[in-house]
């Protein structure tokens, strides 16, 4: 009788793990959340005017090929991810709104990002690719407000 109760508890525990854990893993890392996390980190660096290429966390968010391209281009690298040019309209009070993702292929996503501040509104499109189990930003382009 006691063995039966233990066996039932073990089976129920395995069922709970099987049902709830995969959903928790999927919910924890979506392209939208990844892009929002990147911009929350990036905007702090933007306001501090740091050289983004010296940041150790950049390769965690951005694809190596894009980093190499930006290093070769050597344009105002700080402004690439916001597509705002050299204006300093962003500040730490800027709100980042990430809209619904569009899945292009199994490993490529299009994520619209809106920057809203007191005196500005800007929209960019983040192209995010999935390599293995992690996401990386492959490219950013500007967009018209929609």
Language model features with spans:
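Bacterial N-terminal signal peptides that target proteins for export
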Residues: 1-10
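Bacterial N-terminal signal peptides
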Residues: 9-18
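Boundary at the C-terminal end of the N-terminal hydrophobic targeting segment
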Residues: 24-27
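Short, aromatic-enriched amphipathic alpha-helices that serve as compact interaction elements
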Residues: 29-46
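Short, well-ordered alpha-helical segments enriched in acidic and aromatic residues
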Residues: 34, 47-75
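Hydrophobic pocket/interface hotspot
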Residues: 38, 58, 135
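Surface-exposed, charged secondary-structure patches
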Residues: 63, 67-118
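Short beta-strand edge/turn micro-motifs at domain boundaries
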Residues: 121-146
């Amino acid at each position: 009788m006691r063995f039966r109760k233990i066996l039932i508890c073990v089976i129920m525990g395995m069922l709970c793990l099987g049902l709830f854990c995969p959903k928790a893993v999927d919910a924890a890392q979506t392209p939208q959340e990844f892009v929002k996390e990147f911009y929350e980190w990036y905007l702090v660096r933007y306001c501090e005017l740091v050289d983004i290429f010296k940041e150790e966390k950049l390769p965690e968010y951005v694809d190596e090929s894009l980093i190499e391209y930006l290093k070769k281009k050597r344009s105002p690298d700080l402004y690439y991810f916001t597509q705002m040019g050299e204006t300093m309209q962003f500040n730490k009070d800027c709100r980042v709104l990430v809209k619904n993702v569009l899945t292009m292929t199994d490993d490529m996503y299009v994520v619209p990002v809106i920057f809203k501040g007191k005196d500005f509104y800007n929209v960019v499109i983040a192209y995010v690719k999935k390599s293995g189990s992690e996401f990386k930003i492959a490219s950013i382009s500007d967009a018209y407000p929609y």
